[in-house]
């Protein structure tokens, strides 16, 4: 039996993607739509207060393509808080004109390869990655993924040292994009349909394509990677929500 990798776990994460029922939204009067937008922004302001207190973080993006219209990424210390946020949002008037498109539940995760005598939760760099302040980058790319476990290509049957070696090589590619792409990895084994969620942030959207394409040639992806649906979008600042929903 292969040895399991020890992971470090941070904030719980919810990716909530919704489509707008524009036809139904149009039936409201201008005043009714305005009230619905104000109510939604009041909820977002609560999230801003939490972020300011460094007790969580969030990101809001519009989605390009027909898969969804809006993507919310929420980070919180407990799964209960994610549930409360989702429920509060569902009770708003705006939610009556939203159609659930996709969701993903996970927890921010790092593999722990530090020496046994070092407490990773005392390392400021690790804490910043486990409890991140999500960047206000122009663009987002999110996708879930698995490690293949079929026949001879079974990631989970490989020895620990071999997995470490391959992941080190894999991570070297990612480090070449430092300053261009910010990455948040979240684990979802037992939480959702895939094993990990990968969220990328960048001001130059082409960096997503370059990074992911280059990684395709690395053995970790080429031989062992299996990927779900990709979602890509543009940042939606609070002050532009009203314009986005304007009819």
UniProtKB/Swiss-Prot annotation:
<dbReference type="GO" id="GO:0006785">
    <property type="term" value="P:heme B biosynthetic process"/>
</dbReference>
<keyword id="KW-0408">Iron</keyword>
<feature type="binding site">
    <location>
        <position position="183"/>
    </location>
    <ligand>
        <name>Fe-coproporphyrin III</name>
    </ligand>
</feature>
<comment type="function">
    <text>Involved in coproporphyrin-dependent heme b biosynthesis. Catalyzes the decarboxylation of Fe-coproporphyrin III (coproheme) to heme b (protoheme IX), the last step of the pathway. The reaction occurs in a stepwise manner with a three-propionate intermediate.</text>
</comment>
<feature type="binding site">
    <location>
        <position position="221"/>
    </location>
    <ligand>
        <name>Fe-coproporphyrin III</name>
    </ligand>
</feature>
<feature type="binding site">
    <location>
        <begin position="143"/>
        <end position="147"/>
    </location>
    <ligand>
        <name>Fe-coproporphyrin III</name>
    </ligand>
</feature>
<feature type="active site">
    <location>
        <position position="143"/>
    </location>
</feature>
<keyword id="KW-0350">Heme biosynthesis</keyword>
<keyword id="KW-0349">Heme</keyword>
<keyword id="KW-0479">Metal-binding</keyword>
<dbReference type="InterPro" id="IPR011008">
    <property type="entry name" value="Dimeric_a/b-barrel"/>
</dbReference>
<feature type="binding site">
    <location>
        <position position="129"/>
    </location>
    <ligand>
        <name>Fe-coproporphyrin III</name>
    </ligand>
</feature>
<comment type="pathway">
    <text>Porphyrin-containing compound metabolism; protoheme biosynthesis.</text>
</comment>
<protein>
    <recommendedName>
        <fullName>Coproheme decarboxylase</fullName>
        <ecNumber>1.3.98.5</ecNumber>
    </recommendedName>
</protein>
<comment type="similarity">
    <text>Belongs to the ChdC family. Type 1 subfamily.</text>
</comment>
<dbReference type="GO" id="GO:0004601">
    <property type="term" value="F:peroxidase activity"/>
</dbReference>
<dbReference type="InterPro" id="IPR010644">
    <property type="entry name" value="ChdC/CLD"/>
</dbReference>
<dbReference type="GO" id="GO:0016634">
    <property type="term" value="F:oxidoreductase activity, acting on the CH-CH group of donors, oxygen as acceptor"/>
</dbReference>
<dbReference type="GO" id="GO:0046872">
    <property type="term" value="F:metal ion binding"/>
</dbReference>
<dbReference type="InterPro" id="IPR031332">
    <property type="entry name" value="CHDC"/>
</dbReference>
<dbReference type="GO" id="GO:0020037">
    <property type="term" value="F:heme binding"/>
</dbReference>
<keyword id="KW-0560">Oxidoreductase</keyword>
<feature type="binding site" description="axial binding residue">
    <location>
        <position position="170"/>
    </location>
    <ligand>
        <name>Fe-coproporphyrin III</name>
    </ligand>
</feature>
<dbReference type="Pfam" id="PF06778">
    <property type="entry name" value="Chlor_dismutase"/>
</dbReference>
